């Protein structure tokens, strides 16, 4: 739709806790507004999960109050990965799923994102309808119609069994040592159990959430601890999840990082080998040229979507394809799940490792990653770095120097005043200096 959303960003409503809109009063009203819209859809039942941020308790209570005022029943799962909430929303035939999380962001941020009854992101139409309700004063339903809350005590067990069901039944992980880094986030009590029950020897780190340590120097956004542990333990590989369990970054037996592009490449190549690949692969504007070239050599079609898993999903649905990914670790496998699921994606790579009797490092060799540098540059909230003449001039200079063997991409964050500067090319030193040149232009002028 052409109408602009005021509160919903690319991944729900997100911000710093205690600052609008992530305040108890706004979240209560958001719960009521969502409840008003969803109550018209059908069952009046909503699944609510969260990650391990301390603010999750406060926001959970506010959401529940708002939903109850609109006459909806809330079912709490406790700390649960985002894809688990999508799965449970489907299996419980709920009208919607709600996740309280800011994904890979620091603990002092939080957010609210919604899933439809099919376990997919809400449509623009529904989000706009919720925003329209936010402009109204809260009106409670009749006392006899108020919603109530219940707790789902076996949510973790249900999701663990689902994850295991996506791994080939005749395979086992016996004899494989795996380091699992849960980022002190929502997978902390899920991921180790999944891999352990499939037979692996699991060394778990990032599994001691205290409310403020989520994503701090651990997990998919900072794999240094995971790399060190894999080498120290002489493990077969490492799995790094982000705070809400929808991103996966892997580490091979040598301690090398294996990102979302490489993970999708391995999964697609394996599906092609088995004759089960349906169509091609959807990446994003950030996808490494090496992945595109590697897939091309295999004869696998590839297209780029705008950055963001919702846009990858749009392309997948439009083309009828099943595999999509972002290099940040969102991997969507529509033949198994309805949204990015880090544990399920990891299991598909592990199946390839077991079946091929190759190491993760060997499986990653099929594609050559171009050196790629990403600089995150903060700017003044009221400026637009994409329109700054000095920034434009720096980009032109860099593009001229890189020629046809590289590319530049500037992208504003959908959730904060941050410009992502990506430079890619064959020469690592040139790529690094080029990214810094553009970043410096942003800092000096915006």
From Swiss-Prot:
Catalyzes the conversion of glucosamine-6-phosphate to glucosamine-1-phosphate. GO terms for cellular component: cytosol. Mg(2+) binds at residues 103, 242, 244, 246. The modification Phosphoserine is found at residue 103. It comes from Vibrio atlanticus (strain LGP32). Signal peptide: none annotated. This is Phosphoglucosamine mutase. Its EC number is 5.4.2.10.
């Amino acid at each position: 739709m052409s109408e602009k959303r005021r509160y919903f960003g690319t991944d729900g409503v997100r911000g710093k806790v205690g600052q609008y809109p992530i305040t108890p009063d706004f979240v209560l009203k958001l719960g009521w507004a969502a409840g008003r819209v969803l109550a018209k859809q059908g069952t009046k039942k909503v699944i609510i999960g969260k990650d391990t941020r301390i603010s999750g308790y406060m926001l959970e209570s506010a959401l529940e109050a708002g939903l109850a005022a609109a006459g909806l029943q809330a079912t709490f799962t406790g700390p649960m990965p985002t894809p688990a909430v999508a799965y449970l929303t489907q299996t419980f035939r709920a009208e919607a799923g709600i996740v309280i999380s800011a994904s890979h962001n620091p603990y002092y941020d939080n957010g609210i994102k919604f899933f439809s009854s099919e376990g997919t992101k809400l449509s623009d139409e529904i989000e706009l309808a919720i925003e329209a309700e936010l402009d109204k004063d809260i009106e409670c339903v009749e006392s006899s119609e108020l919603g109530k809350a219940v707790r789902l005590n076996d949510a973790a067990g249900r999701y663990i069994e689902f994850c295991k069901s996506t791994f080939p039944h005749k395979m086992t992980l016996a004899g494989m040592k795996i380091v699992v880094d849960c980022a002190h986030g929502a997978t902390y009590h899920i991921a180790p159990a999944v891999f352990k029950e499939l037979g692996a020897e699991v060394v778990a780190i990032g599994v001691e959430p205290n409310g403020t340590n989520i994503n701090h120097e651990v997990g998919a956004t900072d794999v240094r601890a995971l790399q060190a542990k894999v080498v120290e333990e002489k493990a077969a590989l490492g799995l790094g999840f982000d705070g809400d369990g929808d991103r996966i970054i892997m580490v091979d037996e040598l301690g090398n990082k294996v990102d979302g592009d490489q993970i999708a490449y391995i999964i697609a190549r394996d599906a092609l080998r088995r004759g089960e690949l349906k169509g091609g692969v959807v990446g994003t504007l950030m996808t490494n040229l090496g992945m595109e070239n590697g897939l091309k050599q295999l004869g696998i079609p590839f297209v780029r979507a705008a950055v963001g898993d919702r846009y990858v999903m749009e392309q997948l649905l439009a083309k009828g394809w099943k595999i999509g990914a972002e290099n940040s670790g969102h991997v969507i496998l529509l033949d198994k799940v309805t949204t990015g699921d880090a544990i399920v994606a990891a299991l598909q790579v592990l199946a390839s490792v077991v079946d091929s009797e190759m190491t993760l490092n060997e499986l990653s060799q099929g594609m050559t990653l171009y050196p790629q540098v990403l600089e995150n540059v903060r700017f003044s909230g009221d400026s637009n770095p994409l329109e700054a003449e000095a920034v434009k001039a720096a980009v032109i200079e860099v593009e001229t120097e890189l020629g046809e063997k590289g590319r530049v991409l500037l992208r504003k964050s959908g959730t904060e005043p941050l410009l992502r500067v990506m430079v890619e090319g064959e020469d690592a030193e040139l790529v690094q200096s080029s990214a810094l040149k553009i970043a410096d232009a942003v800092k000096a002028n915006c």
